[in-house]
């Protein structure tokens, strides 16, 4: 079944939208986190159609040309840039654990949302002070 969220890459978006968000961010290179960062930038300009195709194969070669370089910590970079974790973004914004049924709306602000947001803010505070 198709699902809410994204395969991360490949994505199909209009060139105008790519240019509006500035494509991939350099602070995530080389390494992890550029795909969720790109999706967050899309979310912030109002894109709400994130659909993963269930009946498709995606082959990812894990940056074969970059294997010998030191990778960034994409999860930490994402947290410090956006104030929330990739996991929180996938769960509450993209709703990646659900079958695709509609264009997404704003996250539901319930106890689960605020508890997760609180954890993100504690992690943000910790990393902004202790990991320079």
Predicted segments with their positions:
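Acidic donor-binding loop at a coil-to-helix junction in glycosyltransferase catalytic cores
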Residues: 31-37
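Active-site donor/metal-binding and catalytic loop motifs
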Residues: 29, 51-70, 77
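Hydrophobic residues within well-ordered alpha-helices
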Residues: 42-43
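Loop/turn elements at helix/coil->beta-strand transitions in domains of secreted/extracellular proteins
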Residues: 46-48
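Non-catalytic, C-terminal membrane-associated alpha-helical segments of glycosyltransferases
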Residues: 70-76, 80, 88-132
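A recurrent flexible, glycine/aromatic-enriched loop bordering the glycosyltransferase active site
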Residues: 1-20
């Amino acid at each position: 079944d198709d699902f809410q969220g994204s395969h991360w890459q490949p994505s199909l978006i209009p060139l105008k939208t790519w240019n509006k968000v500035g494509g991939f961010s350099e602070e995530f290179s080389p390494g992890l986190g550029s795909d969720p960062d790109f999706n967050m930038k899309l979310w912030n300009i109002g894109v709400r159609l994130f659909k993963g195709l269930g009946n498709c194969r995606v082959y990812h070669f894990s940056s074969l040309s970059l294997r010998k370089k030191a990778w960034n910590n994409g999860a930490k970079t994402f947290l410090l840039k956006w104030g929330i974790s990739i996991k929180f973004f996938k769960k509450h914004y993209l709703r990646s654990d659900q079958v695709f049924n509609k264009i997404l709306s704003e996250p539901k602000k319930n106890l689960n949302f605020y508890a997760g947001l609180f954890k993100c803010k504690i992690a943000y505070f910790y990393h902004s002070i202790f990991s320079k």
